[in-house]
Amino acid sequence: VNVSGWGNDSATSRFQPDSGYQTEYTKFVKQVTNKPVVGVGRLTSPDMMVSLIKQGVLDFIGAARPSIADPFLPNKIQQQRIEEIRECIGCNVCVSCDNLGVPIRCTQNPTMGEEWRRGWHPEKIAAAKTPQSVLVVGAGPAGLECALQLANRGYEVILSEASKQLGGRVISESNLKGLAIWRRVSDYRIYQLQQMDNVNIYLDSALDVQQVLELGIEHVFVATGALWRKDGIGRSSRTPILGLDQVAIYTPDDIMSGASLGPGPIVIYDDEQGYLGSVVADHLSDLGHDVIFVTSASIVSPFTELTLEQKQVQRGLVAQGVGIY
């Protein structure tokens, strides 16, 4: 017997940030049956799992998404390797893949969906044939993961980051409304790197081509990220939109960097149709700005239908008083 629909089982951290959020309306089940009860609800913390079992709320823990983020979750709990657990962030990109009928991917687990590779194991990393130094330029999520796996292979890793902190875009994006838990993407990797003796991290260290060449390191990995365009080229327009130079244009990067927007209404034109346009609209509205949301789609953020969020996204903007066109 299932007492919850899939959309509620698999709520995202954007709308259900608390681990074990279903407990209040599922704890009655143990009182009406002597059958073993399995419960879910974004249970990512071993402490929470143990607590629910000891309290008699559940007999078993269902951890589908947490096990996608870290397939070795049960082993790590059993072996007391708690600090090595790569916790699910509840973004539902895995659910979106399932809804699309394509191989499942995971923001936290880059090896998800690669299990078909014969003779390959995500935690058995082949040692470097020749120990040598490698340079990773950029310490956002991709750069951190690259540095971590190179270090696992035994290379001497130099990680260079232009800014004053590690994490890249995920640091600023996780400051937007509803996305705080996404910071786990950087937190996990930063912690693992800090435990390694063969990793040297340099902050506030922008490098140009000449400086990279002068280091004399044979293998260089560039993970410097990307920025949003300001010219209007996107899903609906393959050429720049005329007249944008006559108004103040901001990108999500500007908003995440804390740009001062000044007085007057803010128009958000969402031609990307992913999740971020609605997040920015919700965030700015929450800060007290008068927000108008314009989209080329028939609904707000159609991608979020695949992550089971769309109705909550659109309903939330309406409740905030955001004009939608």
Residue ranges and their predicted role:
Residues R169-E218, T304-Y325:
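N-terminal Rossmann-like dinucleotide/flavin-binding domain of flavoprotein oxidoreductases
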